[in-house]
Amino acid sequence: MELRDIEIFLMLAEELHFGRTAERLRVSQARVSQAIRKQERRIGAALFERTSRTVRLTDVGRQLRDDLQPVYAGLHDSLERARLAARGVTGRLRVGMMPFNLADLHFYWKEFRSRYPQWELEVRQMVYTDPFGRLRNGELDVLVVWLPVEEPDFTVGPVMLTDPRIVAVTADHELAQRTSVRLEMFADFLHTMPPDVPDYWEDGYLPFHTPRGRTIERGRPVTNAEELINQVGMGEIIHGFPSHVTRHWGMPNIRWIPVPDLATLSYALVWRTDAENEPIRALADTVRELGTFRF
């Protein structure tokens, strides 16, 4: 099996979506389909169950994923260490971002790189699916994520960003002409959240109940930002966001309305306690010294 085909298989096993797999790997969907069919012919069994709406791993696919992941990770790490050594770089810090405003936070990355040129800093935008899992499996070293985070194996570091809340609705929505929206009104409309996240963490972003105890209903879960904003644009849901997204999504059919009684989001550095190292501590110190960015 060629290395690229292994990458395609593992990415599809993670995303369970041919389009997103192609997008993340910067290949065509046809290339993804071709690679999977080739692997299935070679193995003699289906690796994925495909319908018009879902993609799921078969038992054989799950076994292959579990066997290949550590092998691929080890090979990738070996090649990466050799690449860094050739450039005189002694280490790498991989940071995953849940907020969208990478540019607003550039001064943190710039300062870190200036102070620590011996370490490569890699900052990437995260998809919604299982962000904590990416810390636990070693894909990331640090996650910038909204609080609270109450995972026993994680350390919560300094707060990098605080941001007031807004709600997104379509331009023809009954709330669209309001100057503000109360959290109590959320119970009258459908919302959504990522799948398979801890209840306390979801509640920290979008409460399950209004101040008067009414349920805030969730529809089908979403796995990425494009899917989320498309559901809003189609009028299927309304959704609470941090206010910084208005600088990155200029959509004429979407209205952004302040929600003054929805708690401000605080985003902090989070890392695995047993994986803490010098670059992680250095980034945390840099953020503490520069202070919290308040949107």
Regions found by a protein language model. Give the residues of each.
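N-terminal short secondary-structure element
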Residues: 1-35
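N-terminal winged-helix
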Residues: 29-30, 34, 73, 77-80, ...
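A short LG(V/I)-centered, amphipathic sequence patch enriched
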Residues: 40-57
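Short beta-strand-centered segments that line the small-molecule binding cleft or hinge
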Residues: 85, 107-111, 115, 129-169, ...
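C-terminal effector-binding regulatory domain of bacterial HTH transcription factors
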Residues: 86, 229-230, 234, 243-253, ...
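Secondary-structure junction motif
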Residues: 104-105, 146, 179-183, 188-213, ...
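Hydrophobic hinge/microswitch elements
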Residues: 127-140, 146, 194-257
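Flexible hinge/capping segments at coil-to-helix
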Residues: 156-165, 169-191, 281
